[in-house]
Every structure is written in structure tokens, then in C-alpha cells.
UniProtKB/Swiss-Prot annotation:
Structural component of gap junctions. Gap junctions are dodecameric channels that connect the cytoplasm of adjoining cells. They are formed by the docking of two hexameric hemichannels, one from each cell membrane. Small molecules and ions diffuse from one cell to a neighboring cell via the central pore. This is Gap junction beta-2 protein. Residues 14-20, 95-135, 211-226 are cytoplasmic. It is found in: Cell membrane; Cell junction, Gap junction. It comes from Macaca mulatta (Rhesus macaque). Residues 41-73, 157-189 are extracellular. Belongs to the connexin family. Beta-type (group I) subfamily.
Amino acid sequence: MDWGALQTILGGVNKYSTSIGKIWLTVLFIFRIMILVVAAKEVWGDEQADFVCNTLQPGCKNVCYDHYFPISHIRLWALQLIFVSTPALLVAMHVAYRRHEKKRKFIKGEIKNEFKDIEEIKTQKVRIEGSLWWTYTSSIFFRVVFEAAFMYVFYVMYDGFSMQRLVKCNAWPCPNTVDCFVSRPTEKTVFTVFMIAVSGICILLNVTELCYLLIRYCSGKSKKPV
């Protein structure tokens, strides 16, 4: 996957974000995407080739690996990043639509008094208010939901966040209960706990930003004359 393209797209969203949102994007890029691309792939490598079972029965090793690791950690994290990043793109699409509408009205002469030219529309600072506030807030809410959902799926699918050194398997076509060994379990456990911890930090940042937006929205409402 081209993570550079994703970084470029989300980097454009960064200028519409709050200060907390900018911190979230920094954590996403440095502590998740960079770690996933640079380090995690080296740790996992060819997982199935390094999964060893004490049997020569054809197919037993493959079945046992599929039973304990139905989805690769790397692919699950990549899928998580895609889901978590997608709501932020809705904000960029909303801003692009707003500017397109303003350009259309400017060309028609409906708002010529508000802007000197089209370039001023492009460089106008975007404020998180009105319908954009709802889009931005909804995107944060769905980010929290996706983060929490993937953490739950990860915990259930792998029976916790630690990597076992030895797993026992009796699935067909294994002749009996066989012992299977996972390579570099401690190193993988460290990476897994790190990625889960960063997910937790991202959830905390998203919840904090959501509370900040709600408080600002409510305080703005209270200042309006009745």
C-alpha cells in the first residue's frame, strides 16, 4: 500500500483541524504509519514460514497457523489505519464542496462583494462551524468507534495482546495434539502492546477533541441572545 499517498491526503486535512486534531495526525503518522512501515514488517516478516510444528503431517502446520492467526497482525493494523483515516477525508471533501459552491456563486455574481477574486476564496481560512462542525464532529466520533472496535476485535481474535511462545493444536489433519512454536514472541508482544497503547492514546485525543468541540459549541449557543 502507498502510505505516502495517504499521508499527503491527510496532511491536507491537517490545516482544517483543531490543535488537538493536529496532535492526533502527528501521532498517527509517526507512531503508527512509520512504525508499521519501517519496523513491524521486519519483526513479522514471513510469519507462516517461521511458524514451526513438531509434526511432518502434510497440511497440519498450515491449518494450525490459520487457526491461531486468521488475519496477519500487519494486515489488521493496516486495515485499522484505513478505517480510522477515512472519516478525516469526509472533512476535506466537505471543505472542497464549500469552496466549489462559493466559486460558483462568485462567478454568477451572487457574492462578488465578499471576495476580490477566486484566489481569495481558495486561501480563505476555514472555520469549523455550521454544517462543517457536524461533519468534523461526526468524523471524530466514527474514529473513536473504529479504534475501539478494532481493539476489541484484536483482543478477541488473538485471545489477548501477548504473543504465546507455544500453542497446542489438534485440528484436522493433525494426527494428534501437536506443539507449534511462534518465532520471536517477546519482540512481537512488545510491538503489539505498543500499537495498542498508541491506539488508546489516539482514542483519548479524539475524545478530548470531541469534548472541546462540544463545550465550544454549547458556550457559543449560550452567548446568543434569547
